[in-house]
Amino acid sequence: ETYDWLGKLDPTRLVVDNSACETPTTPNFHVATDLADFHVYFLAPDNAIRWRNQIADFAKRARWMWSPHGDTVESGDEPLILSEFGSWGLPRLDRLIADTGHEPWWFTTGRHYYRPSGIQRRFAASGLDRIWPTIDDLAEATQWHQFESMQYEIGQLRRHDSITGYVVTELTDAYWEANGLLDPMRGPKAYHDRLPALLSPDAIHADLRQRDFYGGDDLTAEVSLAGYGPPSTGGEVRWSLEVGGAVALEGRLGIDAWPEQGTIALDSLTIPIPQVDAVADAHLRLTATEADGRVRASDELRLAILPATARRTAAPLRVAIHDPLDIWGIGVRLSEMGHEIVDADSADLIVASELTDAIVNRMDAGGRALILVRSRGAIPENHDLARRVGIHLRRLAHSGWPGQRSPWEGDWVSSWSWILPKEFAGLPERNPLDFAYEAVLPDHVLLGHDPERHRQEVTAGMFVGWVHTPAALIWEFLQGRGSVTLTTFRVAPES
């Protein structure tokens, strides 16, 4: 009734009955509307697959956008608009305090993990200065993480010809809500110079299923071209793969005709990854031009390349496996890496998918164990470990935040994962962890550590929002005369 009333009041305007979104407690939908819009929030790269799948569903005019009660009035041609999405990139503190010399008044607003006050103290107490020299270095790193998340999400939106528009949340940070393209002072974020290409009416997109490679692998990508400019016959996409700052390979894809309004698929792209001697940064660059050479769209994706020799260990161990359900294929994976699978009495290391009393006893007697925490039951609640370790599924609500999602989920208030570079010299140095780590980013976090007292024990972790709720992703500590390493990284079988 309100939709009809407002449409008659001003027939020149589009009317949206309810800008719909899915929430944990109050799912909502459209009944009658001129725009079929929806809000979707997923953290990328952590939940990139969930984003990809939901956007693909949305592009098909999914029924979950509409009332399930049989009372909808649909024409079937309401434009599909993703009217809210985005992620966080913290502002530089030096810019916020430049005029007054102290924290802004709104730092004491916001609740829990989105309350800014005390961020510098938490930064120091969490040991994050081992990764980023200053809080402003951390802030800029989260901004680049925000950009790569938006780049992926916008790329997925523009792959689908049926989706006619999107609205990034938001133009500027709104006080503590740090998902703006600009900071609260209307200043640029670190990626500002990349925004024209990202938000251009014309866009070139390479859809990669992975961004981490070994030398000798093949990079494959589905390439699409979106256009909302003047018609043009012909053109090409020029691509190059740069490794360590130098062009290693380059080539071209033909464009028969530019789309005038929408998206077309081009030929797929296959690029052989060159061999490297050490882990290397790489960039895939694409430029789409008209036949006369005028550039209309460009894009750049950051990749990581590891030496082919890194597939196998340089220090093989005798490893005992405890994986009762054999879900993760741990033994096969370790054998492929060059380790010898033996019984527990002969092992240098026990690798297990769950902790048992027998494993604890072996560690107490001097043994070492690696526990791959892939479920909440991997460590029994009554365990006899030297640290009181808790496991939490990131997508599951937590009792400490009643009525809210788990803070570590990261879909609305971003969570960021990190590793200590000096502890993992053979891995890409990407903090916060980016798409090079997508396949192993964890579903669970480890709780119970004290960031100050246990700082040297935690070599990978996660924080949320304004540097709150620290959690461990790799936690190693002494157990009796031996030691245990716990990790929630999904190191088998996906990777």
Model-derived features: where do they sit?
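Substrate-binding/catalytic cleft of secreted carbohydrate-active enzymes
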Residues: 1-173, 177-186
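Extracellular ligand-binding/catalytic regions of CAZymes and related secreted enzymes
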Residues: 180-182, 186, 237, 297, ...
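Extended acidic/polar, glycine-enriched regions
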Residues: 268-311
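Aromatic-rich peripheral "rim/lid" segments of glycoside hydrolase catalytic domains that contact
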Residues: 9, 149, 154, 160, ...
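Short, solvent-exposed loop/turn segments at secondary-structure junctions
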Residues: 22, 42-43, 86-89, 172-175, ...
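Beta-strand-rich binding/interaction modules
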Residues: 218-257, 266-270, 279-290, 331
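A glycine-rich, often tryptophan-bearing local segment used as a flexible ligand/cofactor-contacting loop or short
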Residues: 354-447
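Helical hinge/lid and interdomain linker segments adjacent to catalytic or ligand-binding clefts
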Residues: 315-391, 487-489, 494
